[in-house]
Amino acid sequence: MVGYRKNVVKSNLELAFPEKSKKEIHQIQKKFYHHFCDMFLEMVKTMSISGTALKKRFVVKNPEELERLQSLDKSHIILLGHYASYEWVNALHFYGLTYEAYGVYKKIKNRYFDCLIKRIRSKHHTTMLATKDVPKQILRNKKDQHLSSYGMIADQAPKGAHAK
């Protein structure tokens, strides 16, 4: 895992921080890989983590906001940054989220790894939806008046989209 997509990571950091020196970029890159390894280990931990332990690690500072959202009797979309163990958003169920939860994910080409990721991310009351299936599911739930919560990563770029 060390050195994963090294050129892409370096290129993205140079685009994001044009004012930084090569040394500073290298330091940020090292911190990225440390964080990336932490995320991988936390994803593995998610396979066996209990709801109680998950709630200790994923703290909602304003659970009353979940109640307010649900009181509107509308489905909602929760946008997440592609940061830390965003899979742990499943803990919202333990904070009183009663809507059926859907996690949107990009299907992985390796069938075994795709099944593993789906199993990990759907452990705590979440149904995983491949990106291409989201519009159909939203329309079906709306037609059936089925209130739902959709979790999506907000900061991923479509293939081929690069800042210039």
Please provide the spans of the model-predicted regions.
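Membrane-proximal helical "anchor" segments flanking the first transmembrane region
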Residues: 1-77, 84-85
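Soluble catalytic domains of membrane acyltransferases
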Residues: 47-164
